[in-house]
């Protein structure tokens, strides 16, 4: 059995795909233990021609990494591409990479070495260099072992993306964790919302293993405006899922995910109104789901989380327009984090 299945969705990335794939075949880890699954989502540029040339050259040099190319008959989106990659994977771990990013040479070796030290860990997360922030993702010098998975949702060890981590494939299969294909916003958030709630142990390593390139990933604001109602409906759909599953393990972490998404939805709503006033959006479903989340916090004896969600309701949401608040949003929300985690521990102890 392969140890790692690398999944690369491909769509119109001819400018970057060579660097991405070359970084995969340049890994110092044993290539015979790696499979690379490339999902061609009906790319319209020369991406697949570039990929074919690189694979043929690699195989002519007797490279031992195996390749599986999946071709879509029509463009279906990144979520379907990733799901097809999961279905095709045979490795012990699954690893996602965006096709305009690249891996550092020791990426898989560093991650798998951490697995050998912590064989019961279901997630092994690498450090990343963010081109946009010109900084590394985690400011750590030693391996961090996380047994309280709340800490992956928020704080200095939070990981919001699906790339740059080894994910136990049997966890995905056992719980049927897949990407939601009928929304075009926050797909990674929703995937991780389910994943983090179902694993027992994660490890974060200090080594930088991944280079993240911005490259206009996801929808641009203009494209969102073109179909604003569907975008807002996507936010509401995911918030409904969050509210329905807001219970049990990782309650605090899941609550922060829900709050962050609610504030993004409100911010989007306000931008549409300011910049495209002719577009009429129905906001009451968004207000309704935020209200349901607040009531759930009250029923579950979570006063700090209730106070936090007030920031996403009228009239308090007006502070989102204040530059100071927007600049220090993460620091301000972290004021609610520690007391919420403390209350969570107390309630868990009482229930036991």
What are these regions (language model features)?
Residues 189, 252-260:
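Alpha-helical scaffolds flanking conserved acidic
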Residues 1-236, 342-351:
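Nucleotide-sugar donor-binding/catalytic module of glycosyltransferases
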């Amino acid at each position: 059995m392969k140890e790692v299945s690398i999944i690369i969705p491909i769509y119109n990335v001819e400018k970057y795909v060579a660097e991405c794939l070359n970084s995969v075949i340049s890994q110092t880890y044993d290539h015979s233990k790696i499979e690379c699954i490339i999902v061609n989502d009906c790319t319209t540029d020369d991406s697949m021609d570039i990929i074919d040339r690189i694979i043929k050259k690699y195989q002519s040099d007797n490279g031992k990494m195996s390749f599986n190319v999946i071709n879509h008959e029509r463009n279906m989106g990144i979520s379907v591409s990733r799901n097809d990659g999961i279905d095709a994977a045979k490795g012990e771990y699954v690893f996602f990479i965006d096709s305009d990013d690249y891996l550092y040479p020791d990426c898989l070796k560093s991650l798998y070495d951490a697995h050998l030290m912590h064989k019961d860990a279901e997630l092994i997360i690498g450090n990343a260099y963010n081109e946009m922030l010109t900084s590394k993702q985690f400011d750590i010098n030693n391996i961090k072992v996380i047994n309280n998975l709340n800490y992956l949702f928020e704080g200095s060890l939070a990981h919001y993306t699906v790339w740059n981590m080894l994910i136990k494939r049997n966890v995905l299969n056992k719980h049927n964790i897949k990407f939601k294909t009928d929304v075009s916003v926050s797909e990674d958030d929703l995937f991780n919302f389910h994943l983090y709630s179902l694993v027992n142990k994660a490890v974060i390593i200090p080594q930088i293993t991944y280079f993240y390139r911005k490259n206009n990933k996801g929808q641009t604001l203009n494209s969102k405006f073109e179909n604003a109602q569907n975008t807002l409906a996507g936010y509401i759909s995911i918030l409904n899922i969050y509210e329905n599953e807001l219970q049990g393990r990782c309650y605090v972490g899941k609550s922060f995910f829900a709050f962050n998404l609610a504030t993004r939805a409100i911010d989007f709503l306000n931008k549409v109104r300011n910049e495209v006033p002719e577009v009429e959006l129905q906001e009451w479903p968004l207000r309704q789901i935020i209200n349901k989340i607040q009531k759930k916090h009250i029923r579950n004896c979570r006063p700090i989380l209730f106070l936090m969600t007030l920031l996403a309701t009228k009239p308090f949401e007006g502070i989102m327009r204040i530059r100071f608040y927007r600049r220090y949003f993460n620091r301000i929300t972290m004021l609610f984090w520690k007391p919420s985690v403390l209350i969570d521990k107390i309630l868990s102890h009482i229930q036991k």
